[in-house]
Amino acid sequence: MSLIAIILTVVATFIAMEFVAWSSHKYIMHGWGWGWHRDHHEPHDNAFEKNDLYGLVGAVMSISMFAIGSPLVLGASAWQPGTWIGLGILFYGIVYTLIHDGLIHQRYFRWVPKRGYAKRLVQAHKLHHATIGK
């Protein structure tokens, strides 16, 4: 693959992951997967939540794509774009974790934005959490 194709694949995957996250949150986490997601909407002092298992699902998706793209794993059957799709999923997971768990829920650091887009993002998420039930 050319460098431009690699970059476009990583960026396209990153962007596509926003749709995957939105739709899985709406239809899975607040649907049949509510059992894992419920504790994310309830106050607690635990370091981890069942909801964190969804992060592991994302990690498995990324690792699987890395494996599909790896000649070390699949030999001549490796599909090179898999590596770059896996990287796009990985980058999305890192950004999502830093923004959602770090900035919004302050699990890793304490910083409350006073203005701008970051403040609006935190406010919108708090409004989402104000909803009781699924």
Q: Each predicted region: which residue ranges?
A:
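Membrane-embedded catalytic scaffold of the fatty acid hydroxylase/desaturase
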Residues: M17-K134
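Hydrophobic alpha-helical transmembrane segments
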Residues: I6-V11, G82-G86
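Short, strongly hydrophobic alpha-helical membrane anchors
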Residues: M1-I4
